[in-house]
């Protein structure tokens, strides 16, 4: 499907990397033509009155574990990078090609190729062929690659192909089957735990190897003070190192696990309050490049178990936008930075022409009421599962309209 006629959205607050300005946006043939205070509708255009609400780029969610269109559309997500942890894993060109074609036209799914066969961390997968099939990056999946030789070869190969390597940063030798972070809370609850330093050790090694290989490294979730310090130092040295985080890790600490509620069983596990505060500081100072939903819907068969036995993961697509807009209201970041974190930066890492309101880019647009109040209710969620750690929490910020390539989507 293609856009039938030009679309002009008037009376909008346009969110661009330079700030938020009043104006209009016009698009045709799936691309943004012009935006600004002097843009006006032309004869034959479809016209939408934004009535002073935010017009922002559709979100680009980097690192989801399931394709969940209703949840994505509710949350303003028009593109999602799918992790290779599927059944079967995305370790063959045919599987990557199938995923790259799925979802269109109302959602573009960008597959992340499995770094190793079966995601077992031993033998490199057919990365170049998977890139040809549509892979936009390489990912280690839910686990860290323990073998440094394999990891170095992966990074060298990725550097030749100019593909970003997306890593999970926990030293598996330390984490084992841990369900919590070592500390007072885990001890009191009697949960199997691993030291927070497992993250810093993994990050330090991967940064050293990425520097050696000259590769682009994206650490999908950084959640500790030491981890942020390592990324900050790597950036200061000019390395192509970026990092992300999910809302749970900057809004919740390990205190949220005190009632054994398995919806707070995450990977990495929730950290101490000091690390949560460090996450907010890292978002504010630019150390964090991406905020993603970490969307990983888990049904009752995975969550209605003892805490240590439950599968980690949260359904995050529907709450991502509201949680990030909360950072704006709390004056941690300005509005334009919120959409750099959730749209522009992930689009650049993936190399896709989206994530920003600019002429010539895809008309992936979200009309947003940043102040609209609502209650997160897992019983009413659009996701394929309701495992949100934010159930019954108040939120602000809802999508009023969504367009993918200029085509209106139902929200």
Language model: regions and residue ranges:
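N-terminal metal-binding scaffold of metallo-dependent hydrolase/deaminase domains
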Residues: 1-42, 407
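C-terminal cap of metal-dependent C-N hydrolases
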Residues: 12, 362-411
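Divalent metal-coordination and catalytic microenvironments
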Residues: 12, 25, 30, 52, ...
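Metal-cofactor-binding active-site regions of metalloenzymes
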Residues: 75-95, 102-123
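Alpha-helix-loop-beta-strand connector modules within alpha/beta enzyme cores
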Residues: 92-109, 156-167, 319-323
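His/Asp/Glu-enriched, well-ordered alpha-helical/loop segment
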Residues: 188-216, 285, 290-291, 296-370
């Amino acid at each position: 499907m293609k856009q039938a006629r030009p679309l002009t959205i008037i009376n909008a607050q346009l969110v661009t990397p330079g700030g938020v300005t009043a104006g209009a946006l016009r698009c045709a043939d799936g691309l943004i033509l012009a935006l600004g205070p002097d843009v006006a509708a032309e004869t034959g255009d479809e016209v939408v009155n934004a009535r002073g609400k935010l017009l922002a780029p559709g979100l680009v969610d980097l690192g989801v574990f399931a394709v969940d269109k209703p949840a994505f559309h509710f949350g303003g997500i028009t593109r999602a990078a799918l992790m290779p942890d599927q059944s079967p894993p995305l370790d063959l060109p045919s599987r990557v090609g199938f995923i790259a074609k799925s979802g269109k036209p109302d959602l573009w799914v960008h597959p992340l190729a499995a770094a190793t066969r079966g995601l077992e961390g031993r033998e490199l997968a057919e990365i170049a062929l998977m890139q040809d099939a549509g892979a936009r990056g390489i990912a280690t999946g839910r686990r860290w690659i323990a073998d440094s030789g394999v990891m170095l070869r992966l990074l060298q190969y990725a550097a030749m192909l100019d593909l970003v390597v997306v890593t999970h940063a926990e030293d598996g030798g330390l984490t084992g089957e841990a369900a919590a972070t070592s500390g007072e809370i885990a001890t009191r609850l009697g949960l199997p735990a691993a030291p927070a330093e497992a993250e810093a050790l993994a990050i330090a090694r991967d940064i050293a190897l990425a520097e050696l290989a000259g590769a682009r490294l994206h650490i999908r979730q950084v959640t500790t003070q030491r981890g942020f310090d390592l990324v900050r130092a790597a950036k200061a040295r000019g390395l192509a190192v970026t990092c992300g985080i999910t809302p749970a890790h900057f809004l919740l600490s390990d205190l949220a696990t005190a009632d054994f509620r398995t919806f707070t069983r995450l990977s990495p596990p929730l950290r101490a309050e000091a690390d949560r505060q460090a996450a907010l500081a890292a978002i504010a100072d630019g150390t964090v490049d991406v905020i993603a939903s970490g969307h990983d819907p888990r049904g009752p068969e995975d969550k209605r178990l003892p805490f240590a036995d439950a599968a980690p993961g949260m359904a995050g697509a529907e709450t991502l936008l509201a949680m990030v807009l909360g950072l704006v209201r709390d004056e941690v970041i300005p509005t334009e930075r919120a959409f750099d974190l959730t749209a522009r930066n992930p689009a650049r890492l993936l190399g896709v022409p989206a994530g920003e309101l600019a002429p010539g880019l895809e008309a992936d647009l979200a009309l947003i009421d940043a102040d609209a109040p609502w209650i997160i209710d897992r019983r009413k969620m659009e996701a394929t599962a309701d495992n949100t750690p934010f159930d019954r929490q108040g939120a602000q910020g809802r999508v009023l309209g969504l367009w993918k390539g200029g085509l209106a989507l139902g929200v």
